[in-house]
Amino acid sequence: MSKSIVFFSTVLVFLFSFSYATPGIATFYTSYTPCYRGTQEGVMIAAASDTLWDNGRVCGKMFTVKCSGPRNAVPHPCTGKSVKVKIVDHCPSGCASTLDLSREAFAQIANPVAGIINIDYFP
């Protein structure tokens, strides 16, 4: 009985956490210009668009990202998973997304063939 309550509570917390997420767009990239001048920050990383960049103040912040649907003709790109990424770069002006994820992070939440997806994200 107590395991059921813990499981149910965990599911509720997860569901409510995404109900407060911000919608956006994600793409992926492979060429990084790190905020940390060459310090490797792993593979679960992202570049922030001008919307989030805030003169670099977002560097080092963590965001949870989940695919919320397609943005092109690739059917059903979402895996149903979420990923936690660290902002380590700036997506330059004209960037087609809110968050430009590493290929590894993108592949956790969507089929890389899609290239661009709708997302929900929160800090």
Curated annotation (Swiss-Prot):
Main localization (coarse): secreted
Gene3D superfamilies given in the database record: RlpA-like domain
A Pfam family: DPBB_1
Subcellular location: Secreted
Signal peptide annotation: 1-21
Domain Expansin-like EG45: 24-123
UniProtKB keywords: Secreted, Signal
InterPro entries in the record: EGC1/2 (IPR044206), Expansin/allergen_DPBB_dom (IPR007112), RlpA-like_DPBB (IPR009009), RlpA-like_sf (IPR036908)
Recorded superkingdom: Eukaryota
Any GO CC annotation of this UniProt entry: apoplast
GO BP annotations, alphabetical order: cellular response to hypoxia; systemic acquired resistance
Biological role: Might have a systemic role in water and solute homeostasis.
Name of protein: Putative EG45-like domain containing protein 1
Gene (UniProt): EGC1
